[in-house]
From Swiss-Prot:
Record location of the Glycyl lysine isopeptide (Lys-Gly) (interchain with G-Cter in ubiquitin) cross-link: K734
Gene3D superfamilies membership: Kinesin motor domain (3.40.850.10)
GO MF annotation: an example: ATP binding
Similarity annotation: Belongs to the TRAFAC class myosin-kinesin ATPase superfamily. Kinesin family. KIN-7 subfamily.
Gene: KIN7E
SMART domains: KISc (SM00129)
Assigned GO CC terms: microtubule
Residue positions binding ATP: G110, Q111, T112, S113, S114, G115, K116, T117
Name the UniProt record assigns to this protein: Kinesin-like protein KIN-7E
Biased composition annotated in UniProt, kind: Basic and acidic residues: 494-505
Domain of life: Eukaryota
Keyword annotations from UniProtKB, A to Z: ATP-binding, Coiled coil, Isopeptide bond, Microtubule, Motor protein, Nucleotide-binding, Ubl conjugation
Length: 862
């Protein structure tokens, strides 16, 4: 017998992982027969058991259709069914789990006078008898059974084994949960000792008489049996484990109505406390049945605090709901059935509680102590020398690494010095060229001669975008305004019919043209065109003279970038440094008056001079080549952008014109300068990217913007202009935020608080897309990769908060970019996003009716 029991225990310990599985609470319903009072009162029985799992309400006409008439559970018992059968069908297996090291609980729930105490007394007696029978049959293990009993009376905990009625305190134990302090715990000697203790508990428990029950329980009673088992002989570490678990027999007080129980005084107070604790228990059960959503208020009642491990924790649980079939108790019976319906949806996860025996622990500690003593007595010199050699090699590697870093820093210092010298020369050149520049004569929207401005490259500082809180964040974009009125057209617009309207500016976003890689590529492929950063406007003169366009070179000569455009739809907007505070925040300008610009001054050869102009501040002073294609349209003098581009392509395809143009704008000299400084571009790119990652985190930049930028610009020399512009933009934002200033985004004030709020809103949006873009297995792998517990709450929001949270970790940046790219479907958009990155992807600003009509009239010119 003992050998068989030992083998069974070994199998049980090996299958411990399988035992620790989720299972639902076992719910049994017992319908008692009518008692003598109900029979004398001619009460009708409205409830009956139609089979072993269903309870039916027969009087459906009285209640209507608001409630179901049938309820199904694990087992249902009629009034004539004995308690032994109720115990054998379900609670027996749950109770005997305690001898296998699994916690278990059995409790009765129902209204007053429904038979809870009667049922629990029988179940407790049968369960304890089976536990002792199991102990007597398994002599190869030593069992220790401890008994304790408490009651909760008016929210005060009393020890039923102690004559002292002093309330006991609850304390939180990290392993056992809520534990009662100083509760008496008796070690059982035999079966007779247990019966004596149960008799003491029945005598100590609070019992009162009401109109519904002569012996009504006025408190919740909890009887706890703790079973600890271990092998009688030390047969090795694997056979020396100790199992310890507990089983709780809980007899709850019944819910009652004061109007039916006719209670008053002390009985009324007792009923209030009973109903309040049962209400808290029902709330906890209902929340657990809904998948543990929201906060579960275990601490609202001492009953729920003690039962917390039994409700959805490390325990197997069985609930016996007792019902009264009388018609006068229909509402109370229905509430009990609703509680049972919620309870059967609650899941628990019980596991075997294994405790290492003291003998095995002592043996292990003795071996560890002997090993440490031997190491102290016999030190190994060879190992020490080996350790010294390893340490020296590590130091040498560190020295080599530091030498490489020193060489890299020296190289960066030399590059910075050379750039500083070039910048100083550039400043001197700008200062010397300011002598021939005209000044502003009148700050109005017209030139001095009354004609409308011919320049279309004027930057509106209020429309300069710094950070976008949408799904895509473009670079700083300056929108060019085209004013295309002559004096006659202006007078026509200011007719009496429009006298009350304010004059409007007609805007058009124009494409930006950049420099080609070389003149030879232009001659070989007629489809390629040069892109300048900003396309200037048209000539507003009525005689149709040839207009001129101005090409603006970026501010840093070393960041010049030449690209090839393979389609006419690939457009880029010019990037610019943020406007000065004097331009954006100047309060002395009257409302309605914008910037006024000086007369255009042309040099020899029809070249437009831009030295010391408002749009060239901080950039190189360059000259734009005059294009021989007429830019003035036939109707109203409106420039045709398409005809301008066609003329530009024809001009560039001419070797003589292209050479002249390259000579005028200084491309040959710039190529030599750029080729010398871009040799170490890969190292410079890594350094600048690290700075950008840090500035993104500091300025709370949009995650989608970070992902687009990180994936599009991967270190190509052609990406240098984007890297430089982004770095300058972020540096400006950081400086503004650190000084307490603000930036502007489409006419709105942007602060660090608003950026942080937009970032939080974006993270919540991305968390909602996790379930749509990733499968269950993919989400589980992502949670493990980002260090999120699989069983934790709000895992998707945790994942969104982890994205782009480590600016100094490039591996984390790569993983974050991959996740965000899939969430926003960046991969499906293709590489065309790189050509469009400088454009604003947000909806355009609303246009007025007159501006819309002007745009419709422009359609014929394109």
């Amino acid at each position: 017998m003992g050998a068989i029991a030992g083998e069974e225990l070994k199998k049980m310990e090996k299958t411990q992982v399988h035992v620790a599985r989720e299972e639902k609470i076992l719910v049994l319903v017992r319908l008692r027969p009518l008692n003598e009072k109900e029979i004398l009162a001619n009460e009708a029985a409205d409830w009956e058991c139609i089979n072993d799992t269903t309870v039916l309400y027969r009087n459906t006409l009285r209640e209507g259709s608001t409630f179901p008439s049938a309820y199904s559970f694990d087992r249902v018992y009629r009034g004539e069914c004995p308690t032994r059968q109720v115990y054998e069908d379900g609670p027996k297996e749950v109770a005997l789990s305690v001898v296998k090291g699994i916690n278990s609980s059995i409790f009765a729930y129902g209204q007053t006078s429904s038979g809870k105490t009667y049922t629990m007394s029988g179940i407790t007696e049968f369960a304890v008898a089976d536990i002792f029978d199991y102990i007597f049959k398994h002599e190869d293990r030593a069992f220790v059974v401890k008994f304790s009993a408490i009651e909760i009376y008016n929210e005060a905990i009393r020890d039923l084994l102690s004559p002292d009625s002093t309330p006991l305190r609850l304390r939180d134990d990290p392993e056992k949960g809520a534990a009662v302090e100083k509760a008496t715990e008796e070690t059982l000697r035999d079966w007779n000792h247990l019966k004596e203790l149960i008799s003491v508990c029945e005598a100590q428990r609070k019992i009162g008489e009401t109109s519904l029950n002569e012996r009504s329980s006025r408190s919740h009673q909890i009887i706890k049996l703790t079973v600890e088992s271990s092998a009688r002989e030390f047969l090795g570490k694997e056979n020396s484990t100790t199992l310890m678990a507990s089983v709780n027999f809980i007899d709850l007080a019944g819910s009652e109505r004061a109007s039916q129980a006719l209670s008053a005084g002390a009985r009324l107070k007792e009923g209030c406390h009973i109903n309040r604790s049962l209400l808290t228990l029902g709330t906890v059960i209902r929340k657990l049945s809904n998948g543990r959503q929201g906060h579960i208020n275990y601490r609202d009642s001492k009953l729920t605090r003690i039962l917390q491990p039994c409700l959805g924790g490390n325990a197997r649980t069985a609930i016996v709901c007792t019902l009264s079939p009388a018609r006068s108790h229909v509402e109370q019976t229905r509430n009990t059935l609703l509680f049972a319906c919620c309870a059967k949806e609650v899941t628990t996860k019980a596991q075997i509680n294994v405790v290492m025996s003291d003998k095995a622990l002592v043996k292990q500690l003795q071996r560890e102590l002997a090993r440490l003593e031997s190491e102290l007595r016999n030190p190994a010199p060879a190992t020490s020398s080996c350790d010294c050699g390893v340490t020296l090699r590590k130091k040498d590697l560190q020295i080599q690494k530091m030498e490489k870093q020193l060489a890299e820093m020296t190289k960066q210092r030399d590059i910075a010095q050379s750039r500083l010298e070039d910048f100083m020369k550039m400043v001197e050149h700008d200062a010397s060229s300011k002598a021939g520049t005209p000044h502003f004569r009148n700050r109005t929207n017209k030139w001095e001669d009354g004609s409308v401005s011919e320049i279309s490259g004027v930057v509106d500082p209020d429309r300069t975008s710094f950070i976008s809180d949408g799904t895509s964040t473009p670079l700083s974009t300056a929108r060019a305004h085209v004013r295309s009125h002559s004096d006659d057209d202006l007078e026509e617009e200011m007719s009496p019919r429009h006298s009350g309207d304010q004059s409007e500016e007609y805007c058009k976003e124009v494409q930006c043209i950049e420099m080609e890689e070389s003149t030879r590529d232009i001659n070989n492929d007629s489809e390629e065109r040069t892109d300048a950063e900003t396309l200037l406007g048209h000539n507003a003169e009525a005689n149709g003279e040839t207009g001129s366009a101005q090409h603006r070179i970026p501010s840093s000569v070393r960041s010049v970038r030449r690209r090839k455009s393979w389609s006419r739809g690939d457009t880029m907007t010019g990037t610019s440094t943020p406007p000065d505070a004097l331009e954006t925040d100047y309060r002395g300008r009257p409302e309605g008056h914008g910037f006024a610009f000086p007369d255009l001054e042309f040099g020899s050869g029809g070249k437009l001079l831009r030295n010391d102009s408002m749009t060239s501040r901080g950039s190189d002073s360059t000259e734009a080549h005059s294009i021989g294609t007429p830019l003035v349209g036939e109707e109203g003098g409106i420039t045709s952008i398409r005809s301008f581009v066609e003329g530009l392509k024809e001009m560039v395809s001419d070797p003589e014109n292209s050479g002249k143009m390259r000579k005028d704008i200084g491309v040959d000299a710039m190529e030599e300068e750029v080729s010398g400084t871009m040799t170490n571009w890969s190292e410079e790119f890594e350094r600048q990217r690290e700075q950008i990652l840090g500035l993104w985190q500091t300025c709370h930049v949009s995650l989608v913007h970070r992902t687009y930028f990180f994936l599009l610009f991967t270190g190509d020399q052609a990406d240098s202009i984007y890297i430089g512009v982004e770095l300058r933009r972020l540096s400006f934002m950081k400086e503004s935020f650190s000084q307490g200033n603000h930036a502007f985004e489409r006419g709105q004030t942007l602060t660090i608080a608003s950026s942080l709020k937009a970032l939080h809103r974006e993270r919540r949006m991305l968390s909602k897309l996790v379930g749509k873009r990733f499968t269950g297995e993919e989400r589980k792998r992502l949670y493990q990769k980002f260090g999120i517990a699989v069983n934790s709450k709000r895992r998707r929001l945790q994942l969104a908060n982890q994205l782009w949270s480590k600016p100094n970790d490039i591996t984390h940046a790569v993983e974050s970019a991959a996740v965000v790219a899939k969430l926003v479907r960046f991969v499906e958009q293709g590489r065309a996003m790189k050509e469009m990155f400088g454009l604003s992807f947000t909806p355009p600003l609303p246009t007025t009716r007159r501006s819309l009509n002007w745009r419709k009239s422009m359609a014929t010119l394109f």
